[in-house]
UniProtKB/Swiss-Prot annotation:
Keywords: Cytoplasm, Oxidoreductase. This is Heterodisulfide reductase subunit B-like protein. It comes from Archaeoglobus profundus (strain DSM 5631 / JCM 9629 / NBRC 100127 / Av18). Pfam families: CCG. The heterodisulfide reductase is composed of three subunits; HdlA, HdlB and HdlC. It forms a complex with the F420-non-reducing hydrogenase (Mvh), which provides the reducing equivalents to the heterodisulfide reductase. Belongs to the HdrB family. The keyword Lipid biosynthesis does not apply.
Amino acid sequence: MVKYGLFLGCNISFNRPDVEVSMRSIFPALGIELDDLVGQSCCPTWGTMPSVDIVGWCAVAARNLALGEEKGIDLMTACNSCYGSLNEARHKMLTNPEIHRKVNEILATIGKRYEGKAKCRHVAWVLYKDVGLEKLKESIKYTLDGITVAVQPGCHFLWPSEVYPDKEEDPFNPKVLRELCEALGAEAPYYTKLIECCGMGALRSTDPEKSFKLVKEKMENIKEEIDADLIVTTCSSCLIQLDDAQERLRKEGKINFSIPVLHLVQVIALCMGFDPEKVAGICVTPRDEIIKRILENKR
């Protein structure tokens, strides 16, 4: 059985425990063993420590990666920010010996060292490459037949592509999330703003008006071009932003429709028959109708 260190990150732990429940449900059922990585901390993501202290950022990231390296396993996350931050920090250490040396000097004060072997995989890539589309199809009890999905890979699933361990994805024409959704039975057509930012992160904190404008433009594009029944994302931040912001836009009269939003692991958990209240129970935009449709599509 393949084993990964489950790196939750702050966002999922504090805001979306249903995503954590989904991961803990589907991966053992798909033959992936999870290690809790006791002692893990914030990754830390862009806009925080990386903006002011490169070595400090890399040291925190390396400490997290070392928790896996000590056990001979890679990390796995459902958070694009964690995925990007941990892998970019690793890339900086592997390409800059001086940063790597300084990081290990810091880690030595707590009895740790990071050689650069352990990396962070994204749940979508683990599902796509380790599990595989055929096994995924065989593992589900319910399908997405008749459901049109708008995929939202999110910025940090795609960029900076050179730092990621799985390099097969074309960030300008991403296929992994679309093919995973299609394996579940969905139609996942292209739409113009597919790779555009959701407006989360520092932008939402510093300029919410611009942040919500990006959501409005993306939502209108999804509605007009593919009239999606569901938005599926690989990113916990995109999940929160698209779920919450569209409700605000509706209340302000800026859009007059709603599209439920789910993380990929939540969709798979629903298709595998896990309890909807546990794996998809937190939302702002209503989900009951789409969950009902999924559970009516019994194989």
